Amino acid sequence: MNKVVLSASFSLLAFAVLAGGPLDNAVLHGETDKARAIDYAPGEEMVFTLSLQGAEAFADGQYFVKWTRTGDDGAKEEGKVDAKSLPLVVKTKLEQPGFVRLEAFVIDAKGKTYTKSFTGNPNTPEGKKALNAFERKDKRVFFDGGAGVQPETLQSVPEPKDFDEFWAKRKARLAKVPMTATVKEHRSSNPSVKVLSFSVACAGPRPVTGWVTIPTDAKRKYPALITFHGYGAHFIQTIPDSGPTDKMHMFINAHGYELGREDEYYTEFYDALKSNGRTFGLDSSWQNKSTDTAYFGWMCYRIMRAMQYLKSFPEWDGKNLTAAGGSMGGLQTMWAAGLDLDVSAAQPSIPWCCDMGGRETLKRNQPNWGVGETEAMRYFDPVNMAKRVNPKCRVEITRAGLGDYCCPPSGISILYNNLKCPKKINWVQGSTHGYVPSEEHQKFSLTSDWE
């Protein structure tokens, strides 16, 4: 009898897991009373409305929404309401230019964060794909968004007085290193495209490494695209088997490691990059105290050399050169555009490290994780690079999240403000660094000289 009861209990438990909870397909939707959430004046009331969408029936007192308001003013407010009472209206204001952040998520009666369960069938090919995507997502039922006051007036701390002189010296140092390249051609699945991997000599401890795909039609010249990857403490670049037929496409890794090596090589490589226990670029106690030891300095050398190498290919049309990337890739995109005037278009998404002076000096709402503020880091701040972009270059910040506090909206606003060229920024309400709401949500764009 005991075995039967145990078996039945197990079956019920398995069914409960498969059945999931009433909020497994729900989203916590948030919006402001203004369609453009950055149009508030100092002291003007901001009204956020939060609602549950896609929820199944649940009881009073079963779930609650816990919310927190923070902002560039340093103020903090908190609250908790029964989820059955939604929609929830949160009213706040900001007396100065900057941003307010509103975070909210669902908890149960014991205060535990609600975590979604996968509701599909993992035994089908489509279900397996959906499960893999589900595992990479934030499983909370949450909203993380914000609103801004006069972001067009925001600025960072003053840039270093010798900013241009500093970079002129760096470029001169790079010029002394001959641009010798080791190139290997790889099998391409498309005979109209050739695939090359390369290692190019560079200033600093390591070369530039990556790959480039080039259309094989020798009768034409092509526009060029260079892309950069985001931060990853163990990112491994792989070589593609083809590429576009209408453009050259180069993709470099940030570090200059060898391509196609065994896993142990990359594990040892990334371990060796650590400084005082921090992964690359994050050690503010020593490495980032000086431009001579800052890891970003070596990355910038590699970007400048990669741009030179890309432009040396006879297949390039000599005029169309686009740089693109997200997060740390967005940071690298702005370095490329700020340090190479041949860049004709830049497409940074959620660009990292904007307004590095906003953390300590200006006391803005900044993340705990990331690059700390030092004077040396101001030479690498993309808000300063933005001022040097070619006035004819078209820059589109393809996504800026009002709830992204890995790359806070205040810093991205300053980047946009400092661009003196055709520019566009796409704001997304409820978007964090790695999340864009699946439901219909507020989004809007700002442009200047954009056609």
State where each predicted segment sits.
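The feature captures the conserved acid-bearing segment of alpha/beta-hydrolase catalytic domains
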Residues: 360-419
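A catalytic-pocket lid/entrance helix-loop region that shapes and gates access to the active site
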Residues: 272-277, 331, 349-380, 427
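C-terminal catalytic histidine-bearing segment of alpha/beta-hydrolase fold enzymes
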Residues: 410-451
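Cap/lid segment of the alpha/beta-hydrolase catalytic domain
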Residues: 236-301, 355-364
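N-terminal targeting or regulatory segments adjacent to alpha/beta-hydrolase or S9 domains
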Residues: 21-193
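Primarily recognizes the serine-hydrolase "nucleophile elbow" in alpha/beta-hydrolase
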Residues: 236-238, 304-364
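Short beta-strand element of the alpha/beta-hydrolase
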Residues: 210-212, 220-231
